[in-house]
Amino acid sequence: MDSVKNILLEYGLRFQEPQIEKVDKYIEELLGVPYNLTAHRDLDSAVHKNVVEILLPLKEELKGTLLDVGSGNGVPGLILAIFFSKLKVVLLDSREKSVNFLRGVIEKLDLENVSVVKERAENFSKERREEFDYVTARAVARLNVLVEICTPALKTGGKLLFYKGPSYIEELKEAQRAMKELKVELEKVREYSLKTGERRALLILRKYESSPEKYPRRVGVPFKRPLL
């Protein structure tokens, strides 16, 4: 079975030994949790899905403040915090089970640049407007919903980093109204493939103006009545 280090080397990803040690501990914790928090039962699958998929499309150093919405098992936010030490990361999730897992992992990995908040994204974004340089999400919602619940917390000039699958083109078309309303524009799409055969895309959107105060709408509404 390949080690974390060997898998990252296969993709030409750069790392330092302390980072590998932390990822090893994280994967160990991840594989030990119940099925309803992660579907990965082996190291190879867990590293590809939770580490390689996150790092592979990133071409620049990330620094500043980053909010990870719907963090779940800590991806992408926790991985970005490990590999980009100049980031100050907030992991946001409304589920008690996820929050407890994340707090435990942060303590075991001795990560000083990460904190966890238990709250709905709609409430958090309204309370912490224009605070973050980056907002990330993966497997949380369709793009039009993400744009509404994430953008208000982003600084003007900041970037949304959304990890998507091959259906992102359809989601982009669907999200045009939300992007216009929330004042963000598509900066670039980085398509990439894993050696497992899976195709992925990192969508990078830039906020060019402050979002209207009426967004995000109250809890649940962006999901039930998305901007179309």
From Swiss-Prot:
The keyword Repressor does not apply. This is Ribosomal RNA small subunit methyltransferase G. GO terms for molecular function: rRNA (guanine-N7-)-methyltransferase activity. S-adenosyl-L-methionine binds at residues 70, 121-122, 138. It comes from the Bacteria. Pfam families: GidB. NCBIfam families: rsmG_gidB. It is found in: Cytoplasm. The keyword Methyltransferase applies. Its EC number is 2.1.1.-. Disulfide bonds: none annotated. Belongs to the methyltransferase superfamily. RNA methyltransferase RsmG family. Specifically methylates the N7 position of a guanine in 16S rRNA. One of its GO terms (cellular component) is cytosol. Keywords: Cytoplasm, Methyltransferase, rRNA processing, S-adenosyl-L-methionine, Transferase.
